[in-house]
Amino acid sequence: MLIYNTLTRRLQEFNEMHRGRVNLFVCGPTVQDHFHIGHARTYIFFDAVAKFLKLEGYSVFYLQNITDIDDKIINRAKEMGIEPSEVAKIYFSEFQEDMKRLKVDSVNFFARATLYIDEIVSQISRMMEKGYAYETDDGVYFEVRKFKDYGELSNQSLDQIIAGYRVAVNENKRNPEDFVLWKKKKAGEPSWPSPWGEGRPGWHIEDTAITETYFGDEYDIHGGGSDLIFPHHEAEIAQMRSISGKRYLAHYWIHTGMININKEKMSKSLKNFITIRDILKDYRPEDLRFAILNANYRTQIEFSKELMEESKKLIDYINDTYRKLEYVNGSGNFKIDVNSVISEMRSLAENDFDFHSVIVKLLAITGEINRNFEGINKEVAEELKKVYLWVDTFLGILEQKKEVSKGIVDDLVELRTRMRKEKNFLISDAIRDVLKKNGIHIEDRGDVTVWWQE
């Protein structure tokens, strides 16, 4: 299996650290507002990654942090007139609900930052002991110039990074590029005890404290949006490697591209900010999963109504065809080598999680099924369903429908056929309309009528 590694900027063969086991960490959200389709892109993609790795036979532990204290949460609490912890509780619950609706259910554990203060303090203390961190009047900072590989992930030299920080925004810091590890307490803000006085953690430190707790000082895969490469992920590497002295924090770094809305960057200031809840008012979870997974994960997605409408149409096409296979009554000898098809799809997905090519292959098979439908018998139909179910294991694009009573529908279809033969079109049309209202699609093929659930 090949993975594009942001750290090395090339495709690399995937070799797990521990045979058959993969430790995967993806940066979770800051729980202070409604979640948008940019979040959806990252979490849907890594949900598919985790599920595909499991399908490949790996035992996957998928860990995600939850930032439940930071400046944004504190400011949001002031706006809402409640405690920061309440803000975090409200929006973490909303996040879980959104993910459930999107079929993102592969995360093994959500680690809330405020439950790891002791681990955070331990890491900062070790950085100070090794000379990488220092205390000031307002907090504790990491001295970037001490870590010579800083900038490797984002493909910048340390000199370039230093040159980019020309103005010191905090006179307490030794150098403008240094980042905060611990913020000393301010009036009215939540705080926890530490050797440097009451305070709270900086943003970057929570992730390495959490991953060290569960994975140790290095692990297999770290994921997140490409907007986190610098400075967030760069800082994570500096923190953990300054303590461990090892070459890697994560062996593979995977980053998803950003989303543009109507060819403009999605942002609140441009008022083109789309929440997950808003998009799900007009489209199904499967439509959004399809739109996201049908794009190369490293590219930008040009998000638009046209994209969603096309995704909706193709999801209908895939699901209608899959459901038709439930009710096939052909007697022909049409065949497809299902094992070969699945093997080809597996190879496509193994090439840097190329889910787009998997979807292209699925659509090609779907077209072939529809062109040869009358030549498909029940045994072949059962085999063909395996292709859709295999793909759905990680892409999650088959729509869940309430089952209808096959016996009742068969009786109604038989009655309608009899009424048509007797030219009693009033009743036959009425039966058709009743079936349609209940999501049953019927198709007359000469003297034979086939039906499937839409």
UniProtKB/Swiss-Prot annotation:
Its cofactor is Zn(2+). Gene3D superfamilies: Cysteine-tRNA ligase, C-terminal anti-codon recognition domain, HUPs. It catalyses: tRNA(Cys) + L-cysteine + ATP = L-cysteinyl-tRNA(Cys) + AMP + diphosphate. A motif ('KMSKS' region) lies at residues 265-269. It is found in: Cytoplasm. It holds the Pfam family tRNA-synt_1e. Its main location: cytoplasm. Binds 1 zinc ion per subunit. SUPFAM superfamilies: Anticodon-binding domain of a subclass of class I aminoacyl-tRNA synthetases, Nucleotidylyl transferase. Zn(2+) binds at C27, D207, H232, E236. ATP binds at K268. Its EC number is 6.1.1.16. Belongs to the class-I aminoacyl-tRNA synthetase family. This is Cysteine--tRNA ligase. It comes from Thermoplasma volcanium (strain ATCC 51530 / DSM 4299 / JCM 9571 / NBRC 15438 / GSS1).
